[in-house]
């Protein structure tokens, strides 16, 4: 399975803001972006005027890195969003939010989307009672995501339950049963990622 191999902190520095790719570490003084908030490389501290195309490209790269999606798959999401009813940019973000690895992250299982992706890949979750180990699996409204019986006893999942995350409006959680439910599709107001999706649409519309 293709994946990003570049250091997470370099990705944040390149985009010029924290993408919170390392979870809790991003909130501490150990965060590389807090110490060196400029782009990586020899000329990282020099300021350049970015063209309109450059702004659009950076916005797309930012979204890809936040959700851990590579170019080919991201383009597929865009095509699906463009064909669907509604606003293309918002449709795109909804598709990304409804990925299983992101839903697992939103439910509080994993300090980062990267960790949540690994948990899904390792087979810790069921969707409607069936094991799913594909991070890109798109969940639907009324789907129930549960932690497998075997995984519930591990220290990692006990820690997640003891430190619950505030859930977005489109999800419900039942900590006692190690489960969460998708109660609706997320609205744009529910999606708190620092992405201007309009710029992404402009880029792909050329």
Swiss-Prot record:
Residues 98-164 form the S4 RNA-binding domain. Part of the 30S ribosomal subunit. Contacts protein S5. The interaction surface between S4 and S5 is involved in control of translational fidelity. Belongs to the universal ribosomal protein uS4 family. It comes from the Bacteria. It comes from Clostridium tetani (strain Massachusetts / E88). InterPro entries: Ribosomal_uS4, Ribosomal_uS4_bac-type, Ribosomal_uS4_CS, Ribosomal_uS4_N, S4_RNA-bd, S4_RNA-bd_sf. The gene is rpsD. This is Small ribosomal subunit protein uS4. Keywords: Ribonucleoprotein, Ribosomal protein, RNA-binding, rRNA-binding. The keyword Iron does not apply. Pfam families: Ribosomal_S4, S4. PANTHER family: 30S 40S RIBOSOMAL PROTEIN, SMALL RIBOSOMAL SUBUNIT PROTEIN US4M. One of the primary rRNA binding proteins, it binds directly to 16S rRNA where it nucleates assembly of the body of the 30S subunit. GO terms for molecular function: rRNA binding; structural constituent of ribosome. HAMAP family: Ribosomal_uS4_B. GO terms for cellular component: small ribosomal subunit. GO terms for biological process: ribosomal small subunit biogenesis; translation.
